Swiss-Prot record:
Cofactor(s), by name: Fe cation
Principal cellular location given in the protein's record: endoplasmic reticulum
Segments traversing the membrane: 39-59, 61-81, 175-195, 200-220
Entry-linked InterPro entries: Acyl-CoA_DS, FA_desaturase_dom
Pathway: Lipid metabolism; polyunsaturated fatty acid biosynthesis
Protein name: Delta-9 desaturase-like 4 protein
Membrane topology term: Multi-pass membrane protein
Length: 300
């Protein structure tokens, strides 16, 4: 088999051939894919049970869970760890990364590796969640085919910076323990209402909000920048995604800590980063220069 990390023509043709012939549900499913699919199915099942176990208190908890875990994903996994768009002390970096684990989107190494591959191979045959393979694939199905991702992108050698840190190695080994403990405590505290209206609804919203950035934000919306991909700005998702849906902005200036580049573009994650910068906690906060903006601007 050819090395999937190479960019020569033979590698690319093999990937395209595999895409055309791949039978999604008839393939062999390794344990990691079965676990991932099971978790997603359970979350959706709990969400369906929510109306039968409804409590306002539990629903409020679910909305808070969604907001905190989604903000943790965008602040920590995405802008801090994936793109290094700002620096914060480890005493702040690690708690935010730990909080993001409870969004049930994987450990930091896994999430960051996938996202870095997405930017390296955006919209190509080797993009982990390429829109070229369909809306459903880019939205959710890619999550359950780790062997396909490995074949397209190669190993996780793009997160060596995280592999060197004990905390992220520890989280990778023990993530299941932390998640099971959290859901056990949730049930012991609030019973089925907190499992369904709380955890189920909260994680369900967080899932689809995140996945819409991968799918919808490469199909619908407006473009402000001349990027060599299909990224779009989707304004109506900006509040729910904590600013991540200004996706054309993001692909134009990947290392920018701010994605809502206009004053009217809601970007809650940026507001948090800016707060830490004002307090002197966040440093080396990266923003696009006016010259960079001029070079990337679409000719109107």
């Amino acid at each position: 088999m050819c090395d999937p990390t190479r960019d020569d023509g033979s590698s690319r043709s093999r990937v395209v051939s595999t895409m055309q012939k791949r039978a999604y549900f008839q393939r062999q499913w390794p344990l990691v894919d079965v676990v991932r699919a099971s978790v997603v199915v359970i979350v959706h099942f709990l969400c369906l049970l929510a109306p039968f176990n409804f409590k306002w208190e539990a629903l409020r908890f679910g909305l808070v869970l969604f907001a905190l875990t989604t903000l943790s994903i965008t602040f920590s996994f995405h802008r801090n760890l994936s793109h290094r768009s700002f620096k914060i002390p480890k005493w702040l970096e690690y708690p935010w990364a730990y909080s993001a684990v409870f969004a049930l989107q994987g450990d930091p190494m896994d999430w960051v590796s996938i996202h870095r591959f997405h930017h390296q191979f955006t919209d190509s045959d080797r993009d982990p969640h390429s829109p070229k393979e369909g809306l459903l694939f880019s939205h959710i199905l890619w999550i359950f085919d780790t062997q396909y991702i490995k074949y397209k992108c190669g190993g996780r050698d793009n997160v060596l910076d995280l592999k060197k840190q004990w905390f992220y190695k520890f989280l990778r080994r023990t993530i299941a323990v932390h998640i099971l403990m959290f859901w056990t405590i949730l049930y012991l505290y609030g019973g089925l209402p907190y499992l369904t209206c709380g955890g189920g609804v909260g994680i369900f919203i967080g899932y689809h909000v995140t996945w819409l950035v991968n799918s919808a934000c490469h199909i619908w919306g407006s473009r402000s920048w001349n990027t060599k991909d299909t990224s779009r700005n989707v304004w109506w998702l900006s509040l729910f995604t904590m600013g991540e849906s200004w996706h054309n902005n993001h692909h134009a200036f990947e290392s920018s800590a701010r994605q809502g580049l206009e004053w009217w573009q809601i970007d809650i994650t940026w507001y948090l980063i800016r707060l830490f910068e004002v307090l002197g906690i966040a440093t080396d906060v990266k923003l696009p220069s006016e010259l960079q903006k001029q070079k990337m601007a679409l000719v109107r």
